[in-house]
UniProtKB/Swiss-Prot annotation:
Descriptive protein name: ATP-dependent RNA helicase DeaD
Function summary: DEAD-box RNA helicase involved in various cellular processes at low temperature, including ribosome biogenesis, mRNA degradation and translation initiation. Exhibits RNA-stimulated ATP hydrolysis and RNA unwinding activity at low temperature. Involved in 50S ribosomal subunit assembly, acting after SrmB, and could also play a role in the biogenesis of the 30S ribosomal subunit. In addition, is involved in mRNA decay, via formation of a cold-shock degradosome with RNase E. Also stimulates translation of some mRNAs, probably at the level of initiation.
Gene name of the record: deaD
Cell compartment(s), UniProt: Cytoplasm
Note: When overexpressed suppresses cold-sensitive mutants of rpsB (ribosomal protein S2) and pyrH/smbA2 (uridylate kinase).
Protein source organism: Escherichia coli (strain K12)
Sorted UniProt keywords: ATP-binding, Cytoplasm, Helicase, Hydrolase, Nucleotide-binding, RNA-binding, Stress response
């Protein structure tokens, strides 16, 4: 007897949602969707334990969408996400799922976007709000977000919000929501802090546990490039030129990005096309047919649009935007290496996305090697190789004698000057090279690449390795470690704003990705504060800090001048730690004891401290993309 397969219709979903799922290519529910949707449709609270990428966005979106009232122009569903990338992704997914529900609007609220843009969107009366905890809390304090009509609350990746330090904001938001709403919480792990939230805010939640099905692909050569030195679209062109591929698929996060990247590639002479959820089925099939028969070489797609895509020609996958989960990454790179062919996969990683790279590596139990951006020398070599291949192809053609006869008719410009065939060949070579010149200008010098701290890169330390402590009075005062010349900056937040040293340290460390050991003395005044940071801060970092907010107030950071040298033993913020306790060497942001301020952050100049182990085993050095591994 054939095994019965559950469909989305079997779960009780109505026609508008089923129609949207059909448009998006969803065929059958994933395990977490099959488990969660019936409970959420019946109004139960749900506690879902599943890895990201298991389909949980649809698991909570579909039933909550079905239960909302499109006529009520007020927030009825609130989704909390740890990052703006995930918030945008969830908002787009819910927009797609509700495309056939008349009058339903979705808004994403996250830091970095202008408030006036978000306020205009909120005035339209969206029924669904997706946002990061910090920005949602800002709107609640301003009175611009009304949750009095809320019927459904979702905490997506709750353990990640805990890891990033948002859990207090999450609890503050949840405490302001009126009783009687439905709550769904999803987390890959279940630490005690998350358990505490479930006990305090959830009503007899139905637990759903789904095991991860991630598998690795040893037949696919994988690598990543840290975004640095040029824009991603410019770097993409370099990588495509350096790599030999039959066909490629470029994965991006949003529909707009598919169009932007496709336009950039078309400008550079690549035969490419976008594939996104706004395309009708006929156009989608036509685009895929062009890719299969060789009329199209590069496809730029979102995860949803690429669902079910199977084209043997694809030999290269570029993750232009890093996926938010490991399973999506595996699904993406699985588009190459089909039918026994070798495949290559490249991942673009921005500095603030390094945790996502670590998650992928941990889940897949492998280390993805880093590659360098192809330089001018490599590009010149590749262009010459491709041009030589075209010349060789013409040398094998049968009608060369006709063209050889034409050579005698090409006369030199000066009378009596003999025709030099080598010079003539060089002139023809220059004419035939096209827009991609065979002689590539050397790369402009770039600032040294900065090294960025990643908590997971610190090796375990045994407390017994510290050696004897000795009597306190016998120990010399701890001297401030030499981190180079410092400069003094002023920020426009002070004691009157309720700011504490820990708020400033957190903002600088998180927004600038700077290790706390490079943050010097901080002094709090009534209306402002001063902070010492390493000399040579790049202009874009200072500009970013100018816009960064602490307790909802812009820092407006300004350089005052060089910091005065200090005697040994001085302490930041009057010699107290982040919580007011006296520090011995300080603590890192995860609460672990840090003797002598251990950690591996970066300076603005990009220099590494001597005596430190490298972040990963780089004994073989970085690989060149497109070169020999």
């Amino acid at each position: 007897m054939a095994e019965f397969e559950t469909t989305f219709a079997d779960l009780g979903l109505k026609a508008p949602i089923l129609e949207a799922l059909n448009d998006l290519g969803y065929e059958k529910p994933s395990p977490i969707q099959a488990e969660c949707i019936p409970h959420l449709l019946n109004g139960r609270d749900v506690l879902g334990m599943a890895q990201t990428g298991s389909g949980k966005t649809a698991a909570f979106s579909l039933p909550l969408l079905q239960n909302l009232d499109p006529e009520l122009k007020a927030p009825q569903i609130l989704v909390l996400a740890p990052t703006r990338e995930l918030a945008v992704q969830v908002a787009e997914a819910m927009t797609d799922f509700s495309k056939h529900m008349r009058g339903v609007n979705v808004v994403a609220l996250y830091g970095g976007q202008r408030y006036d843009v978000q306020l205009r969107a909120l005035r339209q009366g969206p029924q669904i709000v997706v946002g990061t905890p910090g920005r949602l809390l800002d709107h609640l304090k301003r009175g611009t977000l009304d949750l009095s009509k809320l019927s459904g609350l979702v905490l997506d990746e709750a353990d990640e919000m805990l890891r990033m330090g948002f859990i207090e904001d999450v609890e503050t938001i949840m405490a302001q929501i009126p009783e009687g709403h439905q709550t769904a919480l999803f987390s890959a792990t279940m630490p005690e802090a998350i358990r505490r939230i479930t006990r305090r805010f959830m009503k007899e939640p139905q637990e759903v546990r789904i095991q991860s099905s991630v598998t690795t692909r040893p037949d696919i050569s994988q690598s990543y490039w840290t975004v640095w030195g040029m824009r991603k679209n410019e770097a993409l062109v370099r990588f495509l030129e350096a790599e030999d591929f039959d066909a490629a698929i470029i994965f991006v996060r949003t529909k707009n990005a598919t169009l932007e990247v496709a336009e950039a590639l078309e400008r550079n002479g690549y035969n490419s096309a976008a594939l996104n959820g706004d395309m009708n089925q006929a156009l989608r099939e036509q685009t895929l047919e062009r890719l299969k028969d060789g009329r199209l070489d590069i496809l730029i797609a979102t995860d949803v649009a690429a669902r079910g895509l199977d084209v043997e020609r694809i030999s290269l996958v570029v993750n232009y935007d890093i996926p938010m989960d490991s399973e999506s990454y595996v699904h993406r790179i699985g588009r190459t290496g089909r039918a026994g062919r070798a495949g290559r996969a490249l991942l673009f990683v921005e500095n603030r996305e390094r945790r996502l790279l670590r998650n992928i590596e941990r889940t897949m139990k492998l280390t993805i090697p880093e590659v360098e951006l192809p330089n001018a020398e490599l590009l010149g070599k590749r262009r010459l190789e491709k041009f030589a291949a075209k010349v060789q192809q013409q040398l094998e053609s049968s009608d060369l004698d006709q063209y050889r006869a034409l050579l005698s008719k090409i006369q030199p410009t000066a009378e009596g000057e003999e025709l030099d065939l080598e010079t003539l060949a060089a002139a023809l070579l220059k004419m035939a090279q096209g827009e991609r010149t065979l002689i590539v200008p050397p790369d402009a010098p770039m600032r040294p690449k900065r090294e960025f701290r990643d908590r997971d890169d610190r090796g375990p330390r045994d407390r017994n390795d510290r050696g004897p402590r000795g009597d306190r009075e016998d120990r010399p005062r701890r001297e401030r470690r030499d981190v180079g010349d410092m400069q003094l900056y002023r920020i426009e937040v002070g004691r009157d704003d309720g700011v504490e040293v820990r708020h400033i340290v957190g903002a600088i460390a998180n927004e600038g990705d700077i290790s706390s050991r490079y943050i010097g003395n901080i002094k709090l005044f009534a209306s402002h504060s001063t902070i010492e940071l390493p000399k040579g801060m790049p202009g874009e970092v200072l500009q970013h800090f100018t816009r960064t907010r602490i307790l909802n107030k812009p820092m407006n950071m300004q350089l005052l001048g060089d910091a005065q040298p200090h005697t040994g033993g001085e302490r930041r913020g009057g010699g107290r730690g982040f919580g007011g306790e006296r520090r011995e060497g300080g603590r890192n942001f995860s609460g672990e004891r840090r003797e002598g301020g251990r950690g591996d952050g970066r300076r603005f100049s990009g220099e590494r401290r001597e005596g430190r182990a490298p972040r990963r085993d780089d004994s073989t050095g970085r690989r060149r993309f497109g070169g020999d591994a």
